[in-house]
Amino acid sequence: VPGACSTITEEEVKNIEAVLKEAEYVLLQLEVNQEANELVAELACKHGCKVIVNTAPYAPVTDEFLSKAYMVTPNEVEAEEITGVPVKDLESAKKAAAYFYDRGVKEVLITLGSRGVFVSSGGREEIIPCFKVEAVDTTGAGDAFNGGLLAALSEGRDIWEAVRFASGLAALSVQKMGTT
C-alpha cells in the first residue's frame, strides 16, 4: 500500500522493543515517518542494537537522528542532499563522510552506482569496485544492497567482505526487469 510506512505509530514501534533487545542491527529507511524512525533509533541505542540508516528515499534528517546511527548508507545523490557535498570521487566522498562523522556516525558507506561503493570504516577509506554487469532495471538495487549488507554483517563478516557481498546482490538485482 503506497504510503503505508508513513503511518507507523508510536504504539507499533513500542511493540517491537523486545525484538530490538535481542537484535544486533536494525535497518531504518526514510520512507518511514520521522517520529517512528527516531523512536526506533532511540530504543535500539538503549538496548545496544546498532542503527543503520539507509537514507532513501531522501528526506531531511536531524543531527540528533544521525547521532544515533552507527552506520549510514546513502547513495551519492542522497549524500549530497544531506551533506551539501557533491560526491564525484574518493576525495569528495571523504568530505561527505566527515559530515556524518561530525554528527556521531561510526561507519559511512556511499553507493556510487556503476562506480562502486565508498567505504569509510576504522580510519580506512576506499572505493570498492562493483561487479560489472549489464543493468536493465536499477529499481530496488539499493534495497538489495542494504539487505545483503545486513545479512552479511549479521553472519559476522567484516564490513569489507559485507560490502562485496551486498554489491554482488545489487548486481544480480539489476540484470532483469522487475527484480524488486
Locate predicted features.
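Ribokinase/PfkB-type carbohydrate-kinase core domain
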Residues: 1-73, 77-127
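Conserved phosphate-binding/catalytic region of the ribokinase-like
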Residues: 60-65, 90-180
